[in-house]
């Protein structure tokens, strides 16, 4: 009878906060909307055969006691994911081109669209951060009906994946069709000078930041978890960071190419 009451109470009140916020998206991890493997891929993936063989060789060469081996084993989590979540099936990748066009859309689309889409996108990202931005999460858990029934805050990023293509389409439409006939006021027409400036500075800014991350991302993003830093010896941690940084740079380079081609077109 007691068990039944407890079960009923739990169902009525929803999930406890700790369980609900367990799958909270990391703040920097949000950038994998643009660069997919910024924090790795699926936590269920295994490293490449070459990577696994190298790790095994390093452990066999350097680990000399069972105590050291236990510490190393405790330090290893997922080789292919190093974000804030306990595990993931993969990043919430939106696409470099879509993100770039969405960014432009916030400058080109009509104000009646851009402000509410921008506001909804920001709110969605703050909610996806969960325990990493408790001010918003606590309010929604305490005051928004049924919100505490959802398990993973990160899943709300699906809203952004709908809003970004929407603002991108609205922005592109106005970019190509804004003239005296389509606009209600002459001052609302997007001038060629305005379009060129926005396109130029947006491209330079986004490509510049991505290029900086390609060069200095190892010190900015870390590429390791707190658990790995605590338990893994420096030679293993450095090897993991180097391998992960190589993976990141491949995706960052692809993003630069895609954005560059899109901007040029």
Where in this protein do the model-derived segments appear?
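Periplasmic/ER-lumenal interhelical loops and adjacent helix-loop junctions
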Residues: 1-105, 218-256
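Contiguous transmembrane helix-bundle modules in multi-pass membrane proteins
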Residues: 109-265
């Amino acid at each position: 009878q007691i068990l039944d009451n407890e079960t009923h109470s739990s169902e009525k009140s929803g999930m406890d906060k700790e369980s609900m916020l367990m799958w909270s998206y990391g703040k920097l991890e949000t950038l994998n909307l643009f660069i997919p493997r910024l924090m790795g891929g699926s936590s269920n993936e295994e490293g490449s055969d070459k990577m696994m063989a190298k790790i095994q060789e390093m452990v066999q060469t350097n680990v000399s006691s069972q105590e050291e081996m236990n510490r190393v084993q405790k330090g290893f989590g997922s080789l292919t994911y190093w974000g804030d979540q306990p595990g993931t099936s993969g990043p919430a990748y939106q696409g470099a081109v879509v993100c770039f066009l969405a960014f432009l859309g916030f400058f080109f689309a009509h104000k009646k669209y851009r402000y509410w889409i921008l506001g909804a996108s920001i709110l969605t990202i703050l909610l996806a951060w969960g325990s990493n931005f408790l001010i918003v999460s606590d309010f929604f858990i305490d005051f928004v009906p049924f919100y505490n029934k959802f398990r993973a805050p990160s899943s709300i990023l699906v809203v952004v994946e709908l809003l970004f293509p929407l603002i991108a389409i609205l922005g592109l439409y106005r970019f190509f069709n804004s003239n005296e006939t389509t606009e209600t006021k002459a001052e609302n027409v997007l001038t060629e000078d305005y379009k060129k400036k926005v396109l130029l500075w947006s491209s330079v800014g986004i490509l510049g930041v991505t290029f900086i991350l390609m060069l200095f991302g190892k010190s900015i993003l870390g590429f390791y978890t707190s658990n790995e830093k605590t338990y893994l010896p420096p030679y293993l941690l450095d090897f993991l960071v180097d391998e992960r940084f190589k993976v990141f740079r491949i995706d960052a380079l692809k993003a630069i190419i895609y954005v560059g081609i899109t901007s040029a077109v």
